[in-house]
């Protein structure tokens, strides 16, 4: 399962970290993410408030 975590704060970091440990997770993206998340997720340079860009990214990486 591919997962996109939207945000850059501590809660999103904790959620992304938990997802990264799942055997079901095949790809993990964080938008915009933070340096800590970059250790276990692919951070993409999309603002968490840019809904159109987030939807486009999710559709392209389905």
Language model regions located:
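ATP-binding N-terminal substructure of ATP-dependent carboxylate-amine bond-forming enzymes
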Residues: 1-62
């Amino acid at each position: 399962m591919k997962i996109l975590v939207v945000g850059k704060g501590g809660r999103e970091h904790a959620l992304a970290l938990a997802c990264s440990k799942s055997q079901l997770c095949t790809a993990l993206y964080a938008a915009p993410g933070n340096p800590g998340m970059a250790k276990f997720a692919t951070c993409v340079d999309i603002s968490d408030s840019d809904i159109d860009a987030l939807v486009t990214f999710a559709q392209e990486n389905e």
